[in-house]
């Protein structure tokens, strides 16, 4: 009622707006906001608690304290609404205007705004082209600045010290103006003529040659352009009027005992007003200059503190020595306005409690304590009580509820029926952390949770708590039921596999009932149907694990929904037959006729979802759970100390290993191996031993000898409880059992390096003191890591969400033909990820043909590949498929459904409006806590087993070489002379089954295309030495070999052979630094030979530490080893693993010593070395050269005369993503990022779909750098959104003008988030001050396109169900095309958009 009467007096309400603009406020604007000037620093009268007149809480300025009542009490009541009391000056209106009415302070002297002064780059400094130090000297009265030189030789903006100023005054009298303080800066800014300055700068840019100058000029041009375009004036960066925040936003609350609690802002404002008034008085009194100056400086400092305390000098502190919270602190940081109150708010109608198991619940239910439900649904209960006539008023209803009368509970039951509630468990790392359930009222005080959703919530019942929220509106209930119900979220959005999968007890029960054992009671019986089996089992005629034959009726459901059934007799076990009773109709029994390990159960649920759909699967999952619990109870599996069987072979294996270690120790003492080699070998031996013992132990625990029905003794999988648990995937893993019953093995120190003495005991035998001490090292590090990891992982997720938050599906098809080429991932002998898994759920970009048949495509363009299509591709043994990808999507905002493909959580093509960016960020961030924190050291056993020295193929097939260069050795085998060579094994269909890297110098025993058998060795090499291989036959000639200077003669004690080692140039004398030991190969007459097919001499530069075993003049054949470089010499480089690695990749950080890639294709040669660098020259086909200086310590992995292609590695190391983008382009970069990130996750056994990484990569690539501005409005070197450039270029081409040329730029996720078009989104992420300063200067408008901006301004997000709302809003506002164009700043599209894409098309 009150608000209704207030209709006429409402403050300007802005409900409907399309964009928000931020700009500098002019003094006039500030005055127009203000309701009066605050003249006194007083707040409220301590006796009457009434605000003082003209003070910081003045009622005349800001409005009345009580609704419709003036301060002195002359006017009370509604009838005087709008009257201004003549006695106290208060307007009679609502008290809440005190939250919105502002005041102002007229400053006696101008004050520079600290944000525009100190926030780097300093805007005032750029504008005036002065350094920040100089401006500060002027502002804080340490120097004069010339504001108007007149006819004097002084320069404008020249700084003068006190002495210089006085001298100048004497010399030129009043011919020039100079001043100090903010007035001077204000004057300088006011007199800038932006337009002419702009013209002058453009001319200067054209004429200048220096890089640094160009950068500075470009920056200034951009700033001045921004001022011109936004209509801001430069002098507004210096304030003459200060706005005062409404008093209710900086409250002053009386506490008991006559003290007050106040907002820090009041203190800061008080200081400003005090100093301002004092300055005014001093000016009126014509006080001496020095006093006035000091007061002005203090005023400047107090305004600085009010705006951003602590930005300059020491922060002003309050009574408790704590810095006061300034206006800037109010909005930034986790506790600031953006993150604390706008992006996340506390809500009503919510409660939290501990969770317990609800094993009897259905999947869509949760147990809600009655007490809690009553409190949450109170208003609903009140309403119903009134409607039933059980209570006449709300008050009466309240009494009934408080007394908890019987009828209240009945009514609560009705209210709750089919009203879903949301359950949330913190931390909510992905969208499955909030799901909807139908509540079931229960006694007790704990919420009951269905066991199958625990995986999604990552919940366990050791004291976890969950929060309950009630969706109130009908729409909210609808969304909760249709989108968030636990039964609608069976698949994980990260990888499309079921997430409602039984674990632990349930798996154990299902595994136990589906195991087959030999010679059990009833083996060999034949049953007519499953119910007969059940009868037999209940009557104890057969045992659960007995192998029997059963007639099973099988129903097949075809794609059209047609059903056909048939019966067959199946070999199975009693348990599996019982399991078949709960299988839904249409699910093939053979899926369940196996051991039900966790993997198999997951496969079962997945198949059920794909074949039969959602409803059947949900019912099935529930049945599986009930059955699992029932049989786990029956099995009564538990572990005891006797289950940990220690293998008998352990002793022998350990003795062997100890002998080996002793031998290496002796070799080390006699100087045959270096300390590093000894350590590596010892660690290698122990990790091998640990593996052997583990294998022996698994054999001991996992098998047992039994008699079968025929009386023969055979091995079968044992029913050892420990083994059952690990084998089924219920709990524990081989690694853990190995510690219980094998040997604990090697331990790591906190820095990740490995202690070379292993722990030989296991927990069953017990550790001695030293072993225990060694193991505490790593364990403590583990705990410290976990704490750090959680925080880091959360921060990574936050950055990912921020960079991708505005990626939404906006249209069906963008029409691009681009895409990524997908091939299976093969590492070593294993196909890590087959093609079918990589392309499942993607859309084909180009028709796919059978290998070697170009007539009839198997799959046509724009087909969404589902399970059936993928199987077809596999049958046709297709090796690579080009699929659409978000990286190449051409939609102007968001991405299109075709480029994204299947919605992983639903299994069909993604819907328009799906917020795929946030889903991608959550999918990558959520497993972050499972990744390790530590960096692995290569050369330790933890990283992998012993060094590989040969290739033994695992499958039968044919050999194929990939970009391998080789020479034929006299012995008939080939020797590899390229570094990037690879050997693959293809099966009969030409599909790649294995792929191996062939190192330089490897001897290859098979030829290209040869047939090989499984187990055959096809290549071998020396892993500890890097050879240098001769590519021609001839005689050796040494060059620059000076004994004792460049080479040292060594004689091997054992063999007596002499060898020469090249010395390190650093250790040589000055005159020998230039000598370069080379082995050249000459013919019998001594003429230089050349490398075949080139005109380069056959000579090999020997790096330091290399060893030559041949004598000068010795004969060599093709493929012979001329020299070798001990591999131990190459430093073991750390590889970063886990979370830090993922963060580095997403932040696009350059690695420490990045690999150097060839800048162009051509032939390698080496030029003259400089002091610490070697000169590498690449000469391309047309004879132009590119040279690169490379530090001496880096390993160059190419040789003189070798041909390299652009982007190939020439110096070993981790490639930098920026180089890949620059030299190879976007697709290889995407492939590299996806591969590297997936490697980290795969190591932890986490599955993430490539799509998600691609979505993030797309966001990292959204900016481009202008290389040639053409006739566009951009400047060279400027970074612009790709979309902006494309639009601008389209406009220019239409007018037949020169479009701008650009290169893609890779930004890290933090940089990319801060560089988004929306300043609201960027400001709420990080560096709030910098973002807002930048935006204000540019007069940026935020079109509220992303999700975050809309949440902040309090609207529905433009995604999901909100997409239609936004489209409707735009239609309702009835904007014409041209108006739309002015709003969005881009041309309105003329051609009609497809009806389906309508919602998206309006999403400009």
Curated annotation (Swiss-Prot):
Sequence positions that bind Zn(2+) 2: 814, 889, 896, 899
Reaction(s) catalysed by this chain's protein: RNA(n) + a ribonucleoside 5'-triphosphate = RNA(n+1) + diphosphate
Comment on bound cofactor: Binds 1 Mg(2+) ion per subunit.
HAMAP family: RNApol_bact_RpoC
Binding positions (Mg(2+)): 460, 462, 464
SUPFAM superfamilies linked: beta and beta-prime subunits of DNA dependent RNA-polymerase (SSF64484)
The organism of origin for this protein: Xanthomonas axonopodis pv. citri (strain 306)
Similarity section: Belongs to the RNA polymerase beta' chain family.
EC annotation from Swiss-Prot or TrEMBL: 2.7.7.6
Taxonomy, superkingdom: Bacteria
Subunit structure: The RNAP catalytic core consists of 2 alpha, 1 beta, 1 beta' and 1 omega subunit. When a sigma factor is associated with the core the holoenzyme is formed, which can initiate transcription.
Function, in words: DNA-dependent RNA polymerase catalyzes the transcription of DNA into RNA using the four ribonucleoside triphosphates as substrates.
Co-factor(s): Mg(2+); Zn(2+)
InterPro entries reported in the protein's UniProt record: DNA-dir_RpoC_beta_prime, DNA-dir_RpoC_beta_prime_bact, RNA_pol_asu, RNA_pol_N, RNA_pol_Rpb1_1, RNA_pol_Rpb1_3, RNA_pol_Rpb1_3_sf, RNA_pol_Rpb1_4
Entry keyword set: DNA-directed RNA polymerase, Magnesium, Metal-binding, Nucleotidyltransferase, Transcription, Transferase, Zinc
Enzyme class: transferase
SMART domains: RPOLA_N
The protein's name: DNA-directed RNA polymerase subunit beta'
One GO cellular component, as annotated: DNA-directed RNA polymerase complex
Binding residues annotated for Zn(2+) 1, in chain numbering: 70, 72, 85, 88
Gene Ontology biological process terms in this record: DNA-templated transcription
NCBIfam families the UniProt entry points to: rpoC_TIGR
GO molecular function, one term: magnesium ion binding
């Amino acid at each position: 009622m009150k608000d209704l009467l207030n209709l006429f007096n409402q403050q300007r309400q802005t409900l409907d707006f399309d964009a928000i603009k931020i700009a500098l406020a002019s003094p006039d604007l500030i005055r127009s906001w203000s309701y009066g000037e605050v003249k006194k620093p007083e707040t409220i009268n301590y006796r009457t608690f009434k605000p003082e007149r003209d003070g910081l809480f003045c009622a005349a300025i800001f409005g009345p304290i009580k609704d419709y009542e003036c301060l002195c009490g002359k006017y009370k009541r509604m009838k005087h609404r709008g009257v201004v009391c003549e006695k106290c000056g208060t307007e009679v209106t609502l008290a809440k205007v005190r939250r919105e009415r502002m005041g102002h302070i007229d400053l006696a002297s101008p004050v520079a705004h600290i944000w525009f002064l100190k926030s780097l780059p300093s805007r005032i400094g750029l504008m005036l082209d002065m350094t920040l130090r100089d401006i500060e000297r002027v502002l804080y009265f340490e120097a004069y600045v010339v504001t108007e030189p007149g006819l004097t030789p002084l320069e404008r903006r020249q700084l003068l010290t006190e002495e210089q100023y006085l001298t100048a005054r004497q010399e030129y009298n009043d011919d020039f103006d100079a001043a100090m303080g903010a007035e001077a800066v204000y004057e300088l800014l006011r007199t800038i003529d932006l337009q002419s300055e702009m013209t002058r700068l453009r001319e200067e840019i054209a004429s200048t040659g220096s890089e640094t100058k160009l950068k500075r000029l470009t920056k200034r041009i951009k700033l001045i352009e921004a001022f011109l375009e936004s209509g801001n004036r430069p002098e507004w960066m210096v304030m003459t009027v200060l706005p005062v925040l409404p008093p209710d936003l900086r409250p002053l609350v009386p506490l008991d005992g006559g003290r007050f609690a106040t907002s820090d802002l009041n203190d800061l404002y008080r200081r400003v007003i005090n100093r301002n008034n004092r300055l005014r008085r001093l000016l009126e009194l014509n006080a001496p200059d020095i006093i006035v100056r000091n007061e002005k400086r203090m005023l400047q400092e107090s305004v600085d503190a009010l705006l951003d305390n602590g930005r300059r000098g020491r922060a002003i502190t309050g009574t408790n020595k704590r810095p006061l919270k300034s206006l800037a602190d109010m909005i930034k940081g986790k506790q600031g306005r953006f993150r604390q109150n706008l992006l996340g708010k506390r809500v009503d109608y919510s409660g939290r409690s501990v969770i317990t198991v609800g094993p009897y619940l259905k999947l869509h239910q949760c147990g809600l304590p009655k007490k809690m439900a009553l409190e949450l649904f109170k208003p609903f209960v009140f309403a119903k009580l009134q409607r039933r006539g059980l209570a006449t008023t709300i008050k009466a209803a309240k009494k009934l509820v408080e007394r908890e009368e019987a009828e209240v509970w009945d009514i609560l039951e009705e209210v709750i029926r089919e009203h879903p509630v949301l359950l949330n468990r913190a931390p909510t790392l992905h969208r499955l952390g909030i799901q909807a359930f139908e509540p079931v009222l229960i006694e007790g005080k704990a919420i009951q949770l269905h066991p199958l959703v625990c995986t999604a919530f990552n919940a366990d019942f050791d004291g976890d708590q969950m929060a309950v929220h009630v969706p109130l509106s009908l729409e909210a209930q609808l969304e909760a039921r249709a989108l968030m119900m636990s039964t609608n979220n069976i698949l994980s959005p990260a990888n499309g596999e079921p997430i409602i999968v039984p674990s632990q007890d349930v798996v154990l029960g299902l595994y136990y009932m589906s195991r087959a054992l030999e010679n059990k009671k009833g083996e060999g019986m034949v049953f007519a149907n499953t119910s007969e089996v059940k009868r037999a089992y209940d009557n104890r005629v057969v045992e659960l694990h007995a192998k029997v034959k059963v007639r099973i009726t099988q129903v097949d459901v075809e794609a059209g929904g047609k059903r056909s059934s048939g019966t067959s007799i199946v070999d199975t076990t009693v348990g599996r037959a019982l399991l078949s009773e709960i299988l839904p109709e249409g699910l093939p029994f053979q899926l369940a006729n196996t051991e039900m390990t966790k993997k198999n159960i997951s496969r079962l649920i997945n198949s059920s979802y794909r074949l039969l759909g959602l409803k059947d699967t949900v019912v099935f999952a529930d049945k599986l759970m009930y059955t699992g619990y029932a049989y786990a109870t029956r099995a009564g599996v538990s572990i005891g100390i006797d289950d940990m069987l220690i293998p008998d072979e352990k002793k022998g294996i350990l003795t062997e290993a100890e002998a080996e270690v002793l031998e290496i120790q002796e070799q080390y003492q006699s100087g045959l191996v270096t300390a590093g080699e000894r350590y590596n070998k010892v660690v290698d031996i122990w990790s091998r031993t640990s593996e052997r013992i583990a294998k022996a132990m698994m054999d001991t625990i996992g098998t047992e000898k039994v008699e079968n029905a025929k009386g023969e003794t055979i091995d079968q999988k044992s029913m050892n409880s420990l083994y059952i648990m690990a084998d089924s995937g219920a709990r524990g893993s081989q690694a853990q059992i190995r510690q219980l019953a094998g040997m604990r093995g090697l331990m790591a120190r906190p820095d990740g390096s490995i202690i070379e003495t292993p722990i030989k005991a296991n927990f069953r035998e017990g550790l001695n003191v030293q072993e225990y001490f060694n193991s505490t090292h790593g364990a403590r590090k583990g705990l410290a890591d976990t704490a750090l990891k959680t925080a880091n992982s959360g921060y990574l997720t936050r950055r990912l969400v921020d960079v991708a938050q505005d990626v939404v599906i906006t249209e069906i098809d963008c029409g691009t033909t681009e895409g990524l080429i997908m091939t299976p991932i093969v590492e070593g002998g294993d196909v890590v990820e087959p093609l079918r898994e990589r392309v499942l759920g993607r859309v084909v970009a180009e028709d796919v043909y059978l290998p070697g048949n170009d007539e009839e495509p198997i799959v046509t363009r724009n087909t969404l590949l589902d399970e059936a299509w993928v199987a077809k591709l596999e049958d046709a043994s297709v090796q690579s498929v080009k699929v659409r990808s978000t990286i190449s999507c051409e939609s102007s905002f968001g991405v299109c459904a075709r480029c994204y493909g299947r919605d992983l959580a639903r299994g069909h093509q993604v819907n328009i409006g799906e917020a795929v960016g946030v889903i991608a960020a959550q999918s990558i961030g959520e497993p972050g806590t499972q990744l390790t924190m530590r960096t692995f050291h290569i050369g330790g056993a933890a990283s992998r087993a012993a060094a590989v020295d040969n290739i033994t193929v695992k499958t039968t097939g044919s050999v194929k070489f990939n970009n391998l260069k080789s020479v034929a050795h006299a012995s008939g085998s080939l020797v590899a002379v390229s570094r990037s060579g690879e050997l693959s094994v293809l099966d009969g269909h030409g599909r790649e089954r294995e792929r191996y890297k062939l190192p330089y110098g490897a001897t290859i025993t098979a030829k290209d295309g040869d047939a090989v058998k499984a187990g055959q060795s096809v290549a071998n090499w020396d892993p500890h030495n890097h050879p240098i291989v001769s590519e021609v036959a001839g005689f050796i000639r040494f060059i620059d070999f000076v004994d004792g200077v460049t080479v040292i003669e060594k004689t091997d004690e054992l063999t007596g052979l002499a060898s020469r080692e090249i010395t390190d140039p650093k250790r040589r004398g000055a005159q020998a630094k230039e000598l370069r030991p080379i082995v050249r190969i000459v013919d019998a007459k001594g003429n230089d030979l050349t490398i075949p097919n080139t005109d380069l001499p056959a000579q090999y530069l020997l790096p330091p530490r290399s060893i030559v075993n041949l004598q000068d003049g010795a004969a060599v054949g093709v493929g012979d080893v001329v020299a070798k470089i001990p591999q131990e010499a190459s430093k073991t480089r750390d590889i970063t693993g886990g979370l830090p690695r993922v963060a580095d990749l997403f932040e696009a950080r350059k690695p420490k010593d990045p690999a150097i890639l060839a800048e162009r294709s051509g032939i390698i040669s080496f030029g003259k070395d400089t002091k610490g660098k070697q000169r590498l020259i690449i000469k391309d086909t047309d004879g132009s050269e590119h040279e690169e200086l490379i530090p001496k310590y880096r390993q160059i992995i190419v040789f003189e005369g070798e041909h390299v292609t652009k982007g190939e590695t020439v110096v070993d190391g981790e490639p930098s993503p920026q180089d890949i983008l620059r030299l190879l382009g976007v697709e290889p970069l995407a492939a590299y990022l996806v591969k590297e990130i997936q490697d980290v996750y795969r190591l932890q056994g986490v599955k993430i779909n490539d799509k998600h990484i691609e979505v993030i990569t797309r966001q990292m690539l959204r900016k481009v750098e202008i290389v040639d501005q053409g006739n566009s409005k951009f400047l060279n070197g400027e970074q612009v959104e790709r979309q902006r450039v494309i639009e601008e270029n389209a406009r220019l081409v239409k007018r037949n003008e020169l479009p701008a040329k650009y290169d893609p730029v890779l930004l890290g996720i933090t940089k990319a988030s801060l560089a988004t078009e929306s300043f609201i989104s960027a400001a709420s992420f990080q560096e709030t001050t910098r973002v807002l300063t930048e935006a204000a200067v540019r007069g940026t408008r935020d079109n509220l396109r992303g999700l975050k901006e809309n949440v902040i301004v309090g609207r529905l997000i433009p995604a999901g169900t909100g997409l239609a709302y936004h489209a409707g809003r735009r239609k309702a506002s009835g904007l014409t095309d041209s108006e739309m164009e002015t709003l969005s700043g881009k041309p309105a599209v003329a051609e009609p958009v497809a009806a389906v894409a309508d919602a998206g098309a309006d999403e400009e």
